[in-house]
C-alpha cells in the first residue's frame, strides 16, 4: 500500500515509518525541510521524501496522486498567536488534496481532551479533527 506520512520528522513519525516499512508499505514522507529528515540507508528505496508546506496548497502538487492511506501527524506546536488558524488551514488543505483520491483510510493523531477545560493546543487539535472529519475518507482519531 502507498501511504502518505505527514510529520515524518517527529518523534512518532520516525518510529511509525520504520514499522510501516517493516510491514511492506511504500511510504511518501512529507516534510517541510528535507535537511531535517534522516532515515536508515536500508529503507531509502521504499520511501519518497517530498518537501511540501501544507499551508501552501500549490506545493501539495508534488505529492503522488495514488495515495491509498495516510497518517496525519502534523502539529504546529508553535508559540505564535495564530498557530490554531495555521493548523486549521493545513487540515483543510490536506482534506482538499485527498478529494477524488482512492484513499482507504486516514489516521489522525490528536490528543486526550477534556471538553470542560481544553488548552489552546488541544482546542486546536479538536479543530483539526473536525476539519479532517469532513473528508470523503474513513478517519480514525
Pin down the residues of each PLM region:
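Conserved catalytic-site region of short-chain dehydrogenase/reductase
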Residues: 112-123
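N-terminal Rossmann NAD(P)H-binding glycine-rich loop of SDR-like oxidoreductase domains
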Residues: 1-30
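Conserved beta-loop-beta element that borders a ligand/cofactor-binding pocket
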Residues: 110, 130-141
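Hydrophobic residues within alpha-helices
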Residues: 12-16, 94, 128
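General small-molecule cofactor/ligand-binding pocket signal
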Residues: 28, 48-50, 140
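NAD(P)H-binding glycine-rich loop region in Rossmannoid oxidoreductase-like domains
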Residues: 4, 35-101, 113-115
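SDR active-site strand-loop-helix element
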Residues: 6, 30, 73, 106-111
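A short helix->loop->beta-strand "cap" motif at the edges of active sites that frequently abuts
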Residues: 100-105, 136-137
Amino acid at each position: 500500500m502507498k501511504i502518505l506520512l505527514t510529520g515524518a520528522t517527529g518523534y512518532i513519525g520516525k518510529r511509525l515509518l520504520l514499522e510501516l516499512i517493516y510491514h511492506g508499505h511504500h511510504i511518501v514522507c512529507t516534510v517541510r525541510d528535507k535537511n531535517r529528515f534522516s532515515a536508515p540507508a536500508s529503507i531509502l528505496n521504499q520511501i519518497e521524501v517530498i518537501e511540501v508546506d501544507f499551508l501552501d496548497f500549490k506545493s501539495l502538487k508534488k505529492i503522488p496522486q495514488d495515495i491509498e492511506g495516510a497518517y496525519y501527524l502534523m502539529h504546529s506546536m508553535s508559540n505564535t498567536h495564530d498557530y490554531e488558524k495555521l493548523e486549521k488551514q493545513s487540515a483543510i488543505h490536506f482534506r482538499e488534496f485527498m478529494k477524488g483520491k482512492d484513499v482507504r483510510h486516514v489516521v489522525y493523531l490528536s490528543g486526550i481532551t477534556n471538553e470542560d477545560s481544553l488548552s489552546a493546543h488541544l482546542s486546536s487539535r479538536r479543530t483539526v479533527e473536525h476539519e479532517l472529519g469532513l473528508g470523503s475518507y474513513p478517519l480514525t482519531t
